[in-house]
Amino acid sequence: MSGRRRNHPGRLASIPGLRTRTGSRNQHPGIANYPADSSDFRPAQQRRALEQREQQAGQLDPARRSPSMPSANRYLPPLGQQQSEPQHNSAPPCGPYPGERIKVTRAAAQRSREMGYRMYWMVQRAATADGADKSGLTALTWPVVTNFAVDSAMAVALANTLFFAAASGESKSKVALYLLITIAPFAVIAPLIGPALDRLQHGRRVALATSFVLRTGLATLLIMNYDGATGSYPSMVLYPCALAMMVLSKSFSVLRSAVTPRVMPPSIDLVRVNSRLTVFGLLGGTIAGGAIAAGVEFVCAHLFKLPGALFVVAAITISGALLSMRIPRWVEVTAGEIPATLSYRLHRKPLRQSWPEEVKKVSGRLRQPLGRNIITSLWGNCTIKVMVGFLFLYPAFVAKEHQANGWVQLGMLGLIGTAAAIGNFAGNFTSARLQLGRPAVLVVRCTIAVTVLALAASVAGNLLMTTIATLITSGSSAIAKASLDASLQNDLPEESRASGFGRSESTLQLAWVLGGALGVMVYTDLWVGFTAVSALLILGLAQTVVSFRGDSLIPGLGGNRPVMIEQESMRRAAAVSPQ
């Protein structure tokens, strides 16, 4: 490099403390960023000396002094601005010391810590909004998020075994067998969960915690039977444990539904509460929990030949059990509550000779039958849940039938899963902002949309229409569920809402199980599977529409009942009172 180039003023002007040809050693370090040859932009010392000489000569008016002009570089101070001396205080400096250079890793750590703090307080504010921390809703939110995270981590843990290792025919037959073994007890127990909780004065929190503890044991059993060489599990252990985990997750949903009305803040309704819980579960559980499980699974599988996602499942379930016991104690109080019932019978005016029997019935426990709008919404939601359960299992076996490698199969399932997640999130986001004045009408429309999309998928029989049907079904399911919650809140007295919410959730889970069983047993051609599920959806849609019109295809379980029904024993008491 020549001496002329080394001493170029444009090169040295930006280096503090160096002398240039046109400036002194004490020039402003950013002199090159200012216009040249202008007295208004001279360094401060030169300008003050010039002003003093002009004042002494009487040539400068003090009022005409121009202020310091801004710099063209926004990171530099004005040229004439005096830099104040740093004030010494006892607080430690926040930034680096003069001359200290921040490393990339240190800057990234500081930035990550700052973003973590902001994210934590943002989530905390959202979780405690509307008085949720005082009502107990915040304490229930974290177990719900944990349950979503367990489902997501379990899906990551079993993705390799179910979609890479197992043969198609073998996996389908074994899943069908173990589905029968595990789902059949759930189908018997689920209708009894609500009445059992109505009779228990204590035990809701313990039941929620137990659903997590049992899943901890199942995850531990899978870890103990993991074969690191092949990356698989014995079939006699894998399928019962996987399906039992699914059943326990559904049981948690039923148990949670009986607790939610007891922790509802007075400033928001049940629809907003459930939408908030679902959004928290999707963001914090499904997305964040699934990402963490996928990262741990990748590291442990490649470095230690261990099922890392199952260790995440075990850790999350232990946390869920502890968080469930932190729910406030007042969710256990059931004094004054009246259980709800799905059935309803039209009772004619009793004859005089049957009056003693009616008096005996009046002396029994009070019950609250569900009204017409609730029954209509429940039938519509059950119809949609059949489709949701079908889409949960059926695409997996369809993907296995294609002669493609595991990554292609996983990509097909990822596309359908993404559509389901987007639809669910959009449906909950929309339902929280809808004015649900006529919820039964909205449920009927959602049921029609799902049935039409199922018929379209059966005609098209391709992946694109299946993805669209999944998207619409997930969104419609969220909106219909919010409409059902609105019907329960509007048409039931306060002392029966918790019981009615639990009974409805049990019924919805049974419908989901029916759809999942159909997805396992039907032939793995898209048009065949969607034709079979469309037949069920048409029957459910017919019952929904008939119930909406005040009639029923099934005696005692349709819409041939009033919109608002009095408590059963009170109505009978009025009917049999002596004239």
From Swiss-Prot:
<feature type="transmembrane region" description="Helical">
    <location>
        <begin position="504"/>
        <end position="524"/>
    </location>
</feature>
<feature type="transmembrane region" description="Helical">
    <location>
        <begin position="526"/>
        <end position="546"/>
    </location>
</feature>
<feature type="transmembrane region" description="Helical">
    <location>
        <begin position="448"/>
        <end position="468"/>
    </location>
</feature>
<feature type="transmembrane region" description="Helical">
    <location>
        <begin position="148"/>
        <end position="168"/>
    </location>
</feature>
<dbReference type="InterPro" id="IPR036259">
    <property type="entry name" value="MFS_trans_sf"/>
</dbReference>
<dbReference type="GO" id="GO:0005886">
    <property type="term" value="C:plasma membrane"/>
</dbReference>
<keyword id="KW-1133">Transmembrane helix</keyword>
<feature type="transmembrane region" description="Helical">
    <location>
        <begin position="175"/>
        <end position="195"/>
    </location>
</feature>
<feature type="transmembrane region" description="Helical">
    <location>
        <begin position="407"/>
        <end position="427"/>
    </location>
</feature>
<keyword id="KW-1003">Cell membrane</keyword>
<dbReference type="GO" id="GO:0022857">
    <property type="term" value="F:transmembrane transporter activity"/>
</dbReference>
<feature type="transmembrane region" description="Helical">
    <location>
        <begin position="206"/>
        <end position="226"/>
    </location>
</feature>
<feature type="transmembrane region" description="Helical">
    <location>
        <begin position="303"/>
        <end position="323"/>
    </location>
</feature>
<dbReference type="Pfam" id="PF07690">
    <property type="entry name" value="MFS_1"/>
</dbReference>
<dbReference type="InterPro" id="IPR011701">
    <property type="entry name" value="MFS"/>
</dbReference>
<feature type="transmembrane region" description="Helical">
    <location>
        <begin position="378"/>
        <end position="398"/>
    </location>
</feature>
<keyword id="KW-0812">Transmembrane</keyword>
<feature type="transmembrane region" description="Helical">
    <location>
        <begin position="228"/>
        <end position="248"/>
    </location>
</feature>
<keyword id="KW-0472">Membrane</keyword>
<feature type="transmembrane region" description="Helical">
    <location>
        <begin position="279"/>
        <end position="299"/>
    </location>
</feature>
<protein>
    <recommendedName>
        <fullName>Uncharacterized protein ML2143</fullName>
    </recommendedName>
</protein>
<comment type="similarity">
    <text>To M.tuberculosis Rv0876c.</text>
</comment>
<feature type="region of interest" description="Disordered">
    <location>
        <begin position="1"/>
        <end position="100"/>
    </location>
</feature>
<feature type="compositionally biased region" description="Polar residues">
    <location>
        <begin position="80"/>
        <end position="90"/>
    </location>
</feature>
